[in-house]
Amino acid sequence: MIEFVKGTIDYVSPQYIVIENGGIGYQIFTPNPFIYKKNSKETIYTYHYVREDTNALYGFSTREEKMLFTKMLNVTGIGPKGALAILASGDPGAVIEAIENEDEAFLVKFPGVGKKTARQIILDLKGKLADAVPEIAADLFNHEEREQIHEAATALEEALEALRALGYSDREIKKVQPHLKKEEALSTDQYVKKALQKLLK
């Protein structure tokens, strides 16, 4: 089992990153790949997901993120893609609060989460996340700023691709696109966070 990979970011796409270590490039799916900058040195905490038709590495900037991901995978109806979309929201405190308060209306805002799955998340995880992630705080996923060198148009397009990769529909993306265009030049990561804030309202 690979606990983490420490190396250099070789490639960043809307769905995954490639981190090079010892001449080997590891393809790792992450909640928001654009928080990483090419050629930066990173430590990625990994989860090896193996099923009959799938063999993939999922990676996170902190062990807490990884633990939340594994908890989400234990919920019936939540797969890796759904768990990544929830983690990409950038506000784990709000997610945990929604689970503890049985706020189904908040949970169904995530792509792929309907009322039945939201209820299952609450049934399976209520009262259990605090023990799994004792140090969790509302800004857990607000990672250290990584400077982005992108023109605004390119960053916005990458952000829209990232939203599609997370499972948001073109209709949902078109709703937030005008708001994003009004923003001053942002990095791809910042555009994604702004979009998720709008989508989860």
UniProtKB/Swiss-Prot annotation:
A Pfam family of this chain: HHH_5
Segments of this protein annotated with the region Domain I: 1-61
Subcellular compartments: Cytoplasm
Entry superkingdom: Bacteria
Matching InterPro entries: DNA_helicase_Holl-junc_RuvA_I, Hlx-hairpin-Hlx_DNA-bd_motif, NA-bd_OB-fold, RuvA, RuvA_2-like, RuvA_C, RuvA_C_sf
Domain III: annotated span: 151-201
Presence of the UniProt keyword Nuclease in the record: no
GO CC annotation: cytoplasm; Holliday junction helicase complex; Holliday junction resolvase complex
CDD domains the UniProt entry points to: UBA_RuvA_C
Record-level Gene Ontology MF annotations: ATP binding; four-way junction DNA binding; four-way junction helicase activity
Keyword Membrane applies: no
Location, primary (coarse class): cytoplasm
Self-association and partners: Homotetramer. Forms an RuvA(8)-RuvB(12)-Holliday junction (HJ) complex. HJ DNA is sandwiched between 2 RuvA tetramers; dsDNA enters through RuvA and exits via RuvB. An RuvB hexamer assembles on each DNA strand where it exits the tetramer. Each RuvB hexamer is contacted by two RuvA subunits (via domain III) on 2 adjacent RuvB subunits; this complex drives branch migration. In the full resolvosome a probable DNA-RuvA(4)-RuvB(12)-RuvC(2) complex forms which resolves the HJ.
Record's protein name: Holliday junction branch migration complex subunit RuvA
Organism: Bacillus licheniformis (strain ATCC 14580 / DSM 13 / JCM 2505 / CCUG 7422 / NBRC 12200 / NCIMB 9375 / NCTC 10341 / NRRL NRS-1264 / Gibson 46)
